[in-house]
Protein backbone atom coordinates (compact mmCIF):
# COMPACT_ATOMS: atom_id res chain seq x y z
CA UNK A 1 0.00 0.00 0.00
CA UNK A 2 2.77 2.36 0.99
CA UNK A 3 4.72 1.66 -2.20
CA UNK A 4 1.69 2.26 -4.43
CA UNK A 5 0.96 5.57 -2.72
CA UNK A 6 4.54 6.72 -3.13
CA UNK A 7 4.60 5.60 -6.76
CA UNK A 8 1.42 7.50 -7.56
CA UNK A 9 2.74 10.60 -5.86
CA UNK A 10 5.94 10.39 -7.87
CA UNK A 11 4.03 10.14 -11.13
CA UNK A 12 1.66 12.98 -10.40
CA UNK A 13 4.09 15.50 -8.93
CA UNK A 14 5.07 17.92 -11.67
CA UNK A 15 8.30 18.78 -9.94
CA UNK A 16 9.68 15.25 -10.19
CA UNK A 17 11.64 13.77 -13.08
CA UNK A 18 9.65 11.80 -15.69
CA UNK A 19 9.19 8.13 -14.89
CA UNK A 20 11.03 6.07 -17.48
CA UNK A 21 8.54 3.19 -17.34
CA UNK A 22 5.81 5.42 -18.78
CA UNK A 23 5.63 6.88 -22.23
CA UNK A 24 6.19 10.62 -22.49
CA UNK A 25 2.61 11.33 -23.67
CA UNK A 26 1.20 9.44 -20.68
CA UNK A 27 3.55 11.29 -18.34
CA UNK A 28 2.29 14.59 -19.71
CA UNK A 29 -1.33 13.55 -19.29
CA UNK A 30 -0.79 12.55 -15.67
CA UNK A 31 1.10 15.72 -14.84
CA UNK A 32 -1.30 18.08 -16.59
CA UNK A 33 -4.45 16.54 -15.14
CA UNK A 34 -3.14 16.48 -11.57
CA UNK A 35 -5.04 19.61 -10.53
CA UNK A 36 -8.03 19.27 -12.82
CA UNK A 37 -11.45 19.28 -11.07
CA UNK A 38 -12.35 16.21 -13.12
CA UNK A 39 -9.73 14.14 -11.31
CA UNK A 40 -10.22 15.54 -7.83
CA UNK A 41 -12.42 13.42 -5.57
CA UNK A 42 -14.53 15.90 -3.53
CA UNK A 43 -14.19 14.13 -0.16
CA UNK A 44 -10.57 13.03 -0.48
CA UNK A 45 -9.34 14.71 2.72
CA UNK A 46 -9.32 11.32 4.48
CA UNK A 47 -9.40 9.11 1.41
CA UNK A 48 -8.00 5.64 1.99
CA UNK A 49 -7.88 5.93 5.79
CA UNK A 50 -9.49 2.93 7.45
CA UNK A 51 -10.87 3.68 10.94
CA UNK A 52 -9.64 1.49 13.78
CA UNK A 53 -11.07 1.08 17.33
CA UNK A 54 -8.19 2.92 18.98
CA UNK A 55 -8.22 5.79 21.46
CA UNK A 56 -5.47 8.34 20.86
CA UNK A 57 -4.50 8.89 24.49
CA UNK A 58 -3.26 12.39 25.37
CA UNK A 59 -3.69 13.30 21.71
CA UNK A 60 -2.51 16.89 22.31
CA UNK A 61 1.04 15.60 22.92
CA UNK A 62 1.37 14.69 19.26
CA UNK A 63 3.23 16.90 16.79
CA UNK A 64 -0.08 17.82 15.17
CA UNK A 65 -2.99 17.09 17.54
CA UNK A 66 -6.17 15.64 16.00
CA UNK A 67 -4.70 15.27 12.51
CA UNK A 68 -1.98 12.84 13.63
CA UNK A 69 -4.63 10.51 15.00
CA UNK A 70 -6.22 10.46 11.56
CA UNK A 71 -3.10 10.37 9.40
CA UNK A 72 0.46 10.19 10.66
CA UNK A 73 3.32 12.42 9.59
CA UNK A 74 4.61 9.68 7.29
CA UNK A 75 1.28 9.57 5.45
CA UNK A 76 0.61 6.10 6.85
CA UNK A 77 -2.99 5.91 7.91
CA UNK A 78 -3.72 5.81 11.64
CA UNK A 79 -7.49 6.10 11.64
CA UNK A 80 -8.13 6.39 15.39
CA UNK A 81 -11.86 6.76 16.05
CA UNK A 82 -11.29 8.27 19.49
CA UNK A 83 -9.19 11.24 20.64
CA UNK A 84 -8.68 12.96 23.98
CA UNK A 85 -7.89 16.52 25.03
CA UNK A 86 -7.11 17.75 28.54
CA UNK A 87 -8.48 21.25 29.13
CA UNK A 88 -7.93 23.97 31.71
CA UNK A 89 -10.21 26.99 32.09
CA UNK A 90 -8.48 30.33 32.62
CA UNK A 91 -10.07 33.72 32.03
CA UNK A 92 -13.01 32.16 30.20
CA UNK A 93 -10.71 30.39 27.71
CA UNK A 94 -10.20 26.62 27.43
CA UNK A 95 -6.51 25.80 27.08
CA UNK A 96 -5.21 22.35 26.14
CA UNK A 97 -2.34 20.64 27.97
CA UNK A 98 -1.45 17.98 30.50
CA UNK A 99 -0.49 20.41 33.23
CA UNK A 100 -0.64 24.16 33.76
CA UNK A 101 3.04 24.70 32.98
CA UNK A 102 2.50 23.22 29.50
CA UNK A 103 -0.25 25.66 28.50
CA UNK A 104 0.24 28.35 25.89
CA UNK A 105 -2.13 31.03 24.68
CA UNK A 106 -2.18 29.54 21.17
CA UNK A 107 -3.11 25.98 22.18
CA UNK A 108 -6.83 26.10 22.92
CA UNK A 109 -9.70 23.67 22.53
CA UNK A 110 -10.94 25.86 19.72
CA UNK A 111 -7.67 26.02 17.77
CA UNK A 112 -6.52 22.41 18.25
CA UNK A 113 -9.81 20.54 17.98
CA UNK A 114 -13.01 22.44 17.18
CA UNK A 115 -11.68 24.34 14.17
CA UNK A 116 -9.75 21.36 12.68
CA UNK A 117 -12.81 19.16 13.16
CA UNK A 118 -15.00 21.67 11.37
CA UNK A 119 -12.44 21.93 8.58
CA UNK A 120 -12.38 18.17 7.96
CA UNK A 121 -16.15 17.75 8.30
CA UNK A 122 -16.82 20.52 5.81
CA UNK A 123 -14.64 18.64 3.35
CA UNK A 124 -16.36 15.31 3.97
CA UNK A 125 -19.75 17.01 3.66
CA UNK A 126 -19.39 19.21 0.56
CA UNK A 127 -22.37 21.01 -0.89
CA UNK A 128 -23.74 19.11 -3.84
CA UNK A 129 -26.67 19.55 -6.22
CA UNK A 130 -27.13 15.78 -6.08
CA UNK A 131 -28.34 15.62 -2.47
CA UNK A 132 -31.56 17.08 -1.12
CA UNK A 133 -30.03 18.62 2.00
CA UNK A 134 -26.97 18.83 4.24
CA UNK A 135 -25.22 15.52 4.92
CA UNK A 136 -23.83 14.29 8.26
CA UNK A 137 -20.90 12.18 7.15
CA UNK A 138 -18.11 11.52 9.63
CA UNK A 139 -14.42 12.31 9.28
CA UNK A 140 -13.58 9.00 7.58
CA UNK A 141 -14.38 8.86 3.88
CA UNK A 142 -14.09 5.06 3.86
CA UNK A 143 -16.70 4.74 6.63
CA UNK A 144 -18.85 7.86 6.62
CA UNK A 145 -21.16 6.56 9.34
CA UNK A 146 -18.35 6.09 11.87
CA UNK A 147 -18.51 8.62 14.70
CA UNK A 148 -15.37 10.20 16.14
CA UNK A 149 -15.29 10.13 19.94
CA UNK A 150 -13.96 13.41 21.33
CA UNK A 151 -13.10 13.02 25.01
CA UNK A 152 -12.68 16.26 26.92
CA UNK A 153 -10.82 15.76 30.20
CA UNK A 154 -11.61 18.69 32.50
CA UNK A 155 -8.56 19.43 34.62
CA UNK A 156 -9.74 22.31 36.80
CA UNK A 157 -13.01 23.63 38.23
CA UNK A 158 -15.37 21.33 36.37
CA UNK A 159 -18.52 23.09 37.55
CA UNK A 160 -17.34 26.34 36.02
CA UNK A 161 -15.53 24.88 33.02
CA UNK A 162 -18.28 22.63 31.66
CA UNK A 163 -20.63 25.44 30.49
CA UNK A 164 -17.67 26.89 28.57
CA UNK A 165 -17.09 23.50 26.93
CA UNK A 166 -20.75 23.26 25.93
CA UNK A 167 -20.49 26.74 24.43
CA UNK A 168 -17.26 25.84 22.59
CA UNK A 169 -19.12 23.06 20.79
CA UNK A 170 -21.48 25.57 19.14
CA UNK A 171 -19.91 25.43 15.63
CA UNK A 172 -20.32 21.64 15.57
CA UNK A 173 -23.82 22.02 17.01
CA UNK A 174 -24.87 24.59 14.42
CA UNK A 175 -23.71 22.28 11.64
CA UNK A 176 -25.64 19.36 13.19
CA UNK A 177 -22.46 17.30 13.51
CA UNK A 178 -22.90 16.19 17.13
CA UNK A 179 -24.39 12.96 18.45
CA UNK A 180 -27.30 13.95 20.65
CA UNK A 181 -30.00 12.85 23.05
CA UNK A 182 -33.55 14.11 22.65
CA UNK A 183 -36.04 14.13 25.52
CA UNK A 184 -33.77 11.84 27.54
CA UNK A 185 -34.78 8.85 25.45
CA UNK A 186 -33.90 9.23 21.78
CA UNK A 187 -30.30 8.66 20.66
CA UNK A 188 -29.38 10.44 17.42
CA UNK A 189 -25.89 9.44 16.17
CA UNK A 190 -23.68 12.05 14.59
CA UNK A 191 -20.19 12.49 13.13
CA UNK A 192 -18.76 13.55 16.52
CA UNK A 193 -19.62 12.12 19.94
CA UNK A 194 -18.40 14.30 22.82
CA UNK A 195 -17.67 12.59 26.13
CA UNK A 196 -16.77 14.54 29.25
CA UNK A 197 -14.28 12.94 31.61
CA UNK A 198 -11.96 13.93 34.44
CA UNK A 199 -13.61 16.74 36.38
CA UNK A 200 -16.74 16.81 34.22
CA UNK A 201 -19.72 17.34 36.56
CA UNK A 202 -22.17 14.47 36.11
CA UNK A 203 -25.04 16.63 37.36
CA UNK A 204 -24.62 19.08 34.48
CA UNK A 205 -24.71 16.25 31.96
CA UNK A 206 -27.73 14.29 33.18
CA UNK A 207 -29.79 17.38 34.02
CA UNK A 208 -30.25 18.24 30.34
CA UNK A 209 -33.06 16.27 28.66
CA UNK A 210 -31.84 17.47 25.26
CA UNK A 211 -28.07 17.46 24.96
CA UNK A 212 -25.19 16.72 22.61
CA UNK A 213 -22.58 15.52 25.10
CA UNK A 214 -22.10 12.48 27.29
CA UNK A 215 -20.28 11.31 30.43
CA UNK A 216 -17.39 8.90 30.85
CA UNK A 217 -19.06 6.14 32.84
CA UNK A 218 -17.31 4.72 35.93
CA UNK A 219 -16.61 1.16 34.79
CA UNK A 220 -16.09 -0.03 38.36
CA UNK A 221 -19.73 0.63 39.22
CA UNK A 222 -22.29 1.42 36.53
CA UNK A 223 -25.28 1.43 38.85
CA UNK A 224 -27.72 4.05 37.58
CA UNK A 225 -25.87 4.55 34.30
CA UNK A 226 -27.27 3.85 30.84
CA UNK A 227 -25.85 4.13 27.35
CA UNK A 228 -27.80 7.39 26.98
CA UNK A 229 -25.57 8.86 29.68
CA UNK A 230 -22.38 6.95 28.98
CA UNK A 231 -21.94 5.27 25.59
CA UNK A 232 -18.49 4.24 26.82
CA UNK A 233 -17.20 3.64 30.35
CA UNK A 234 -13.58 3.52 31.43
CA UNK A 235 -11.24 2.86 34.30
CA UNK A 236 -7.56 2.29 35.05
CA UNK A 237 -6.45 -1.21 34.11
CA UNK A 238 -3.81 -1.15 36.84
CA UNK A 239 -6.41 -0.37 39.50
CA UNK A 240 -8.49 -3.32 38.38
CA UNK A 241 -5.82 -6.00 37.99
CA UNK A 242 -2.89 -4.72 40.06
CA UNK A 243 0.66 -5.68 39.08
CA UNK A 244 1.19 -7.19 35.65
CA UNK A 245 4.12 -9.56 35.18
CA UNK A 246 6.02 -8.59 32.06
CA UNK A 247 7.98 -11.85 31.95
CA UNK A 248 4.92 -14.07 31.81
CA UNK A 249 3.65 -15.66 28.61
CA UNK A 250 0.12 -14.56 29.51
CA UNK A 251 0.02 -10.92 30.71
CA UNK A 252 -3.04 -11.45 32.92
CA UNK A 253 -3.51 -14.35 35.32
CA UNK A 254 -6.91 -16.08 35.71
CA UNK A 255 -7.96 -13.86 38.62
CA UNK A 256 -7.10 -10.70 36.69
CA UNK A 257 -8.89 -11.95 33.58
CA UNK A 258 -11.99 -12.71 35.60
CA UNK A 259 -11.97 -9.16 37.00
CA UNK A 260 -12.02 -7.50 33.58
CA UNK A 261 -14.49 -10.03 32.18
CA UNK A 262 -16.91 -9.18 34.95
CA UNK A 263 -16.65 -5.46 34.18
CA UNK A 264 -16.98 -5.91 30.42
CA UNK A 265 -20.00 -8.19 30.86
CA UNK A 266 -21.73 -5.69 33.16
CA UNK A 267 -21.12 -2.86 30.69
CA UNK A 268 -22.30 -4.84 27.66
CA UNK A 269 -25.53 -5.72 29.45
CA UNK A 270 -26.21 -1.98 29.43
CA UNK A 271 -25.00 -1.56 25.82
CA UNK A 272 -22.04 0.45 27.11
CA UNK A 273 -18.63 0.12 25.49
CA UNK A 274 -15.44 -0.35 27.52
CA UNK A 275 -12.06 1.37 27.50
CA UNK A 276 -9.16 0.69 29.87
CA UNK A 277 -6.54 3.38 30.39
CA UNK A 278 -3.22 3.25 32.25
CA UNK A 279 -2.21 0.25 30.18
CA UNK A 280 1.54 -0.50 30.10
CA UNK A 281 3.34 0.75 27.01
CA UNK A 282 6.56 -1.11 27.75
CA UNK A 283 7.93 -3.68 27.17
CA UNK A 284 6.54 -3.73 23.63
CA UNK A 285 5.75 -7.43 23.81
CA UNK A 286 3.71 -6.90 26.98
CA UNK A 287 1.86 -3.94 25.45
CA UNK A 288 0.95 -5.95 22.37
CA UNK A 289 -0.14 -8.97 24.38
CA UNK A 290 -2.37 -6.76 26.52
CA UNK A 291 -3.90 -5.18 23.43
CA UNK A 292 -4.56 -8.65 22.06
CA UNK A 293 -6.08 -9.84 25.31
CA UNK A 294 -8.28 -6.79 25.85
CA UNK A 295 -9.53 -6.85 22.28
CA UNK A 296 -10.32 -10.56 22.53
CA UNK A 297 -12.24 -9.94 25.76
CA UNK A 298 -14.44 -7.36 24.04
CA UNK A 299 -13.34 -3.80 24.80
CA UNK A 300 -14.72 -1.10 22.50
CA UNK A 301 -11.51 0.94 22.33
CA UNK A 302 -7.84 0.13 22.81
CA UNK A 303 -5.91 2.84 24.62
CA UNK A 304 -2.77 3.83 22.71
CA UNK A 305 0.03 6.34 23.10
CA UNK A 306 1.82 4.98 20.02
CA UNK A 307 -0.89 5.22 17.36
CA UNK A 308 1.46 3.95 14.64
CA UNK A 309 2.00 0.74 16.59
CA UNK A 310 -1.73 0.45 17.18
CA UNK A 311 -2.39 0.84 13.48
CA UNK A 312 0.11 -1.91 12.76
CA UNK A 313 -1.64 -4.15 15.26
CA UNK A 314 -4.77 -4.05 13.13
UniProtKB/Swiss-Prot annotation:
Natural source organism: Arthroderma benhamiae (strain ATCC MYA-4681 / CBS 112371) (Trichophyton mentagrophytes)
GO molecular function: phosphoric diester hydrolase activity
Signal peptide positions (record): 1-21
Sugar-modified residues: 91, 184
Locations listed in the record: Secreted
Homology family: Belongs to the AIM6 family.
Keywords annotated in UniProt: Glycoprotein, Secreted, Signal
A GO BP annotation: lipid metabolic process
Cross-referenced InterPro entries: HAT_RTT109-like, PLC-like_Pdiesterase_TIM-brl
Protein's recorded name: Altered inheritance of mitochondria protein 6 homolog ARB_06966
GO cellular component terms given for this protein: extracellular region
Amino acid sequence: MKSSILASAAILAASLEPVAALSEPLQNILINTDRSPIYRYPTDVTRGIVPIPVHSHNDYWRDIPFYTALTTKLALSAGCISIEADVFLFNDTLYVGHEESALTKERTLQSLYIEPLMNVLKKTNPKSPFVSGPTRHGVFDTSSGQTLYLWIDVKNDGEKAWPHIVKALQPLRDANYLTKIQNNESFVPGPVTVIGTGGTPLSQVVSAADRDYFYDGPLKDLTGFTSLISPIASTSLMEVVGDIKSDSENPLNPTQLEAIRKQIKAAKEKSIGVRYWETPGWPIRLRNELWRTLWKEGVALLNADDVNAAKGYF
